[in-house]
């Protein structure tokens, strides 16, 4: 068997910077910094988003960004949608 072909699987401290939550789990991620957590020194890896701050898991859906995207789409491509004729709108009423 060949030696040194597997990555180093170790305990790593992940930090969700948006929610300020720490997770201690095992990973093969390579880090340059370490941090003390609960009395022990661990490799430290900051995260922008995790299950603690992701809108799907927190239930805080952001509708404003979606509405803005739809409005932007309609503004750009609304003219291509084909306009209803006056006869069609009168018949609908």
From Swiss-Prot:
The gene is rpmE2. This is Large ribosomal subunit protein bL31B. Disulfide bonds: none annotated. The keyword Ribosomal protein applies. One of its GO terms (cellular component) is ribosome. Part of the 50S ribosomal subunit. The keyword Ribosomal protein applies. Belongs to the bacterial ribosomal protein bL31 family. Type B subfamily. Gene3D superfamilies: Ribosomal protein L31.
């Amino acid at each position: 068997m060949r030696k040194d072909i597997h990555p180093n699987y170790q305990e790593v401290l992940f930090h969700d910077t948006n929610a300020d939550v720490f997770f201690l789990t095992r990973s093969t991620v390579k880090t340059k910094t370490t941090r003390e957590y609960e009395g022990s020194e661990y490799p430290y890896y900051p995260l922008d988003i995790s299950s603690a701050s992701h809108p799907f898991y927190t239930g805080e859906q952001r509708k404003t960004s979606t509405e803005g995207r739809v409005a932007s789409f309609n503004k750009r491509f609304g003219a291509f949608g084909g306009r209803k004729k006056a006869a069609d709108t009168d018949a609908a009423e």
